[in-house]
Design a protein with these regions (language model features):
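Residue-level preference for the first positions of well-ordered beta-strands
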Residues: 9-11, 34-36, 89-92, 116-118, ...
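Short, hydrophobic beta-strand segments that form beta-sheet elements in well-ordered domains
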Residues: 36-39, 117-122, 255-261, 278-279, ...
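Glycine-rich P-loop/Walker A and Walker A-like loops and their local beta1-loop-alpha1 context
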Residues: 4-33, 202-262
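Phosphate-binding/switch region of NTP-binding enzymes
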Residues: 121-174, 337-392
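Charged, amphipathic alpha-helical linker segments immediately N-terminal to NTP-binding catalytic cores
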Residues: 159-205
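Conserved inter-motif catalytic segment of the P-loop NTP-binding fold
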Residues: 33-101, 256-315
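Long, charge-rich C-terminal accessory regions
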Residues: 223-225, 231, 235-248, 252-254, ...
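P-loop NTPase motor core
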Residues: 79-137, 293-353
């Protein structure tokens, strides 16, 4: 995200626990090397704990708290003195509700600084004189649906630039909050990650047709930033095919296997980084952290068992999980497997390419990447799955 919209006086407000402080800390670190943090309601030690959890550089922060001090004019004067003495690049004021809600005080705070400022408040800060003066106004909120938490940052006003969207989803994770932008299926990286074609073999005519249609493909595979969905059956052959695809990608690039249930484990016959992330964990930001840990520096994320996410948490949650990965790692290619369900149009816009594979047949249901051959027979010979173009 372009942080130039935060180059003036920004006010972030919302209910407690929605992630205001975490977002302010992350943005502040991106705006300057030296950060002055003024806290009106939390002790310095608690702010330090948050900085450590977010894995930010604590040496860049000078933290002052003014807990239980009732002389507000004296506090304002002290903040001004600290600002002059510290000479920071950016200031964070956490707890602007502490100050009198009048134009005179708001003007004093607004005019005190000539560098980027991020002020944090709770309601009714969004209707205060300071909100009127602010260059950037963000309302943060959260809601729960089917047991899953959703955080939002809504840009209500921006004088110094165009925000990326009117509203962004947000996840508070180690390493700093991730602003989750909608995935753009046309925004792909230049590098292709091919199947090794040792376990999954496409017939020569299919490979040649694909190479002619897409010069960036020497053979079937994934582009950086792309997403492919495979809808397969639930039988042993289906699990073996999914494992074959996984292992072929693992031979071409670092690949991480993340699964919501252990069904596929016994079918994986190659050395690949793997991790179980239960569906219930994906209802909150801790589960998204687990995804980050599981993916690490892999080039391909192989997600198995996503039908369970749809059944238990809903399509909305699946979209957030996928968009989180794309926002955190725009270069990450995703191969997503759904077992025992039919491809649904509700899911199509989450993927560049959608396959249906079952009972010896494979069909490209959707392709934004130019698959010229859409139907295949699938035959298993000598330990490999062969995809042979078919008119049936």
């Amino acid at each position: 995200m372009d942080l130039s919209v935060f180059s003036g006086f920004s006010l972030i407000y919302g209910e407690p626990g929605v992630g205001k402080t975490s977002l302010a800390l992350r943005i502040a670190e991106g705006l300057g090397r030296k950060i002055l943090y003024i806290s009106m309601y939390e002790y310095k030690s608690k702010i330090e704990d948050k900085i450590k959890y977010l894995q930010l550089d604590i040496d860049r922060f000078s933290i002052y708290d003014f807990i239980n001090i009732s002389e507000r004019e004296a506090v304002l004067e002290a903040i001004g003195d600290i600002y002059v003495r510290e000479a920071p690049d950016v200031v964070v004021i956490d707890g602007v509700n502490y100050f009198p809600d009048n134009r005179e005080t708001a003007s004093a705070i607004y005019r005190m600084f000539d560098i980027p400022v991020i002020a944090i408040g709770e309601e009714p800060a969004g209707r205060s004189p300071l909100a009127y003066m602010a260059d950037l106004l963000i309302e943060m909120r959260q809601e729960f649906s089917r047991g899953a938490r959703y955080r939002y940052a809504r840009f209500l006003k921006s004088r110094l630039g165009q925000p990326p969207a009117a509203e962004l989803r947000l996840a508070v994770v180690r390493g700093g909050p991730v602003l989750i932008e909608p995935w753009n299926e046309g925004k792909l990286g230049p590098a292709a990650i091919p199947l090794s074609m040792r376990r999954v073999v496409f017939a020569a005519e299919a490979v040649e047709a694909l190479a002619a249609a897409r010069q960036d493909y020497a053979r079937p595979g994934l582009l950086e930033g792309s997403r492919v969905a495979d809808f397969v059956g639930q039988g042993p052959e289906d699990m073996a095919l999914a494992s074959a695809v996984l292992c072929d990608y693992a031979e071409s690039a670092r690949t991480a296997l993340i699964y919501t249930h252990r069904t596929i484990e016994r079918f994986v016959k190659c050395d690949v980084k793997r991790r179980l992330v239960p569906v219930d964990a994906l209802a909150d930001d801790k589960g998204l952290e687990a995804l980050m840990d599981a993916v690490g520096d892999a080039k391909v994320a192989f997600l198995h068992g996503l039908e369970q996410v749809v059944f238990r948490l809903g399509v909305r949650r699946l979209r957030l999980v996928l968009d989180f990965l794309s926002s955190w790692r725009p270069d990450l290619a995703v191969a997503a497997f759904f077992s025992g369900v039919e491809p649904s149009p509700r899911l199509f816009d989450m993927f560049n390419t959608v396959w249906r594979i079952e009972a010896g047949k494979a069909e490209v249901v959707k392709s934004m990447l130019g698959w010229p051959v859409r139907r295949f027979k699938v035959e298993r010979r000598e330990g490999a799955f062969h995809f042979i173009p078919s008119s049936i």
